[in-house]
Regions:
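Signature of Asx- and small-polar-rich beta-strand/turn repeats characteristic
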Residues: 1-609
């Protein structure tokens, strides 16, 4: 019976690119021809059972073996033809590919608390008893999956009042606020490095698999130095979140104590690798001065080759401070997989609750009542959890990873950076880049955000400050961006249709409204994107019962603002545009740096006539 493993290896060998396309028999044939032409007087018998045949077999086997290893080494240089796990993992590391571990799922968790009403205004809660639920609060599900709160849930503002109730002649408000949670478990590990440790760039492999995030790394020094994760050890700055007066700012700070992560996709483990400087903090942020390595030339006008220790070039504070002789404590989150994609309303209770009352000096009995009234749930199912990628899946991802760059070269690079900015520093909803008509050296970056009701709002000064600092680390020298608020133009849709006598008018009108709202997908419009009026007309004409459209196409989309608002329960901004001047051949173009918004579905008006 054939060995399946050997057969598979042979199949891979013969199917791959081969530098020397010869097997044993071909080597033997050439050797036989060479022996007969050069050693015919010494050996004349080269049959299988003869001494000459044995020598030919030996030489052919050696030739085939050498060919195999040459082909193997050549093929291992290419990620597409590499067959060994070690070689493929090396290509994955060179490509700086990340994300091959099991990923956690994410879900929006709703927090509900019961707070006593304010004594002066019964419609508002007593602000002294509005808590902050801090990030890293633990939650667990009915199915046994743990979740961790990723951001602070601050009830001081932007809460939602669900209902009011009265108990024992005291008025209470039921408040709701949401926060993002990700699946996983928080673990701690401590390890020490000896003072006489001679290894360069000390490292330690963490015990748990599928580590998704390192929360904190610090040592036992008297100053308790915190180590920061960087992409490579020569990167000496990191982003730091600074909270000032309830605004979050994004600063860039030096990181003399830093580390990189090395991921082993074969066993799912993560290794932390530190710098190699001798516990010295780099003051100027420069690499080792080459002048320190220069050798003086005395009493002669020539020099010979002199051996230098390469460590002198890398033993620099610019590559990070070494933790030699210290104890390191690591706090991290691990875990993930498809089974972490829990169903709706599966999150049941807290596993650990971290909270504070910023308006109270001491937590009293009433504050404890507020905490005890707290409940949590997830209205939607969790998404994003995936199992670890196989080596073949990682191989296919190498080309994309190799094309990634750390610089903003074109508009697509800038938009990708903006949308991937850490959520701790704010989220933008839409962004667009346009040339500045006044100068060729600057671009206008238009941004817009959303509030809790999914309405467009201008970005805060803190968010603009964060964006400026964030893109400054990636932009090419000479590139200038003006961060500008995108103008929001509230619109309404007006259609006058003629309906067939065989159909109910109210039903057809409702169908037209619903189809326009569903198929046009106004909420997906980008900054500067136009509206296809012809598409709206086609949607209406395709609705059963509609005979003709009698509206002027230039007036199908109209400005909706505070001056022409006749409904007291709707609010609009003051921006306006000319639907006639911006209309051309069935397309309504947005003003420069503007975005259209259909704020209410009721703003789709369809009449008959």
């Amino acid at each position: 019976m054939s060995n399946v493993s050997i057969i598979n290896k042979e199949r891979k060998y013969f199917n791959r690119n081969r530098l020397i396309n010869k097997n044993k028999e071909e080597f033997k044939s050439e050797l036989l021809e060479y022996a007969r032409s050069n050693f015919k007087d010494q050996i004349s018998d080269f049959s299988e059972a003869s001494l000459g045949g044995m020598l030919l077999d030996f030489a052919a086997i050696v030739g085939e073996s050498l060919t195999y290893y040459i082909d193997q080494q050549i093929n291992e240089l290419n990620y597409e033809t590499a067959v060994t796990e070690h070689g493929l993992l090396q290509h994955i590391r060179k490509a700086n590919l990340i994300g091959g571990f099991a990923s956690p799922s994410s879900v929006i968790v709703d927090f509900l608390i019961l707070v006593e009403a304010d004594t002066e205004n019964k419609e508002l809660p007593n602000k002294d008893y509005l808590p902050i639920i801090h990030k890293e609060t633990g939650m667990t599900t009915n199915s046994g999956v743990n979740f961790i709160l990723s951001e602070d849930v601050d009830f001081q503002n932007n809460y939602k009042i669900i209902e009011t109730t009265t108990t024992n002649n005291r008025d209470y408000l039921l408040l709701e606020k949401s926060g993002i949670a990700t699946s996983g478990n928080i673990s701690y590990e401590s390890f020490s490095f000896d003072l006489d440790e001679e290894e360069n760039f000390l490292s330690y492999t963490l015990e748990n698999e599928n580590i998704t995030r390192i929360i904190k790394v610090e040592d036992n020094d008297s100053f308790i130095n915190e180590y920061y994760e960087v992409e490579f050890l020569s990167q000496d700055t990191v982003y730091e979140k600074v909270k000032n007066n309830k605004e979050v700012y994004f600063n860039v700070r030096p990181a003399p104590f830093r580390y990189i992560l090395e991921r082993d996709y074969e066993d799912g483990l993560t290794t932390i690798r530190f710098g190699n400087a001798n516990n010295q903090i780099n003051e100027d942020g420069l690499l080792t001065n080459p002048e320190e390595l220069s050798l003086p030339i005395k009493s002669r006008d020539y020099f010979s080759n002199i051996s230098l220790d390469p460590k002198n070039l890398i033993n620099s504070p610019s590559l990070g401070v070494s933790p030699v002789g210290k104890t390191i404590t690591v706090k991290y989150i691990h875990g993930g997989g498809q089974d972490h994609n829990i169903l709706a309303r599966d999150i049941a209770e807290f596993s650990s609750l971290n909270y504070s009352f910023p308006n109270l000096e001491n937590v009293d009995a009433d504050a404890i009542v507020v905490i005890n009234s707290m409940s949590i749930t997830n209205k939607n199912k969790a998404v994003g959890g995936t199992n670890p990628l196989s080596l073949e899946e990682l191989r296919s991802a190498i080309p994309t990873a190799m094309k990634m760059q750390s610089r903003i070269v074109n508009h697509e690079d800038l938009l990708s950076r903006l949308y991937s900015m850490p959520s701790d520093f704010g989220r933008i909803s839409k962004a667009s880049i346009l040339d500045n008509s006044n100068t060729k050296n600057a671009k206008d970056l238009f941004v817009i955000c959303r509030d809790l009701n999914s309405n467009y709002v201008n970005a805060s000064d803190a968010l603009k400050f964060n964006i400026s600092n964030f893109i400054n680390e990636f932009r090419i020298i000479g590139d200038t961006f003006n961060i500008v608020d995108a103008k929001v133009f509230n619109i309404s849709v007006f259609l006058k249709i003629k309906i067939s006598s065989n159909y109910d008018s109210s039903t057809v009108v409702t169908d037209v409204k619903d189809k326009i709202f569903t198929l046009m997908m106004f909420e997906k419009l980008q900054i500067g994107e136009s509206i296809n009026i012809n598409k709206i007309i086609k949607i209406a004409l395709d609705t059963p019962g509609v005979l003709t459209i009698s509206s002027n196409f230039k007036n199908v989309i109209r400005t909706k603002n505070s001056s022409n608002n006749i409904s007291s329960d709707r609010t609009y901004n003051d921006n306006s545009f000319s639907s006639i001047e911006n209309y051309e051949e069935g397309i309504l173009y947005s003003p420069r740096g503007g975005i259209f918004q259909l704020k209410y579905q009721e703003d789709i008006e369809v009449i008959t006539g």
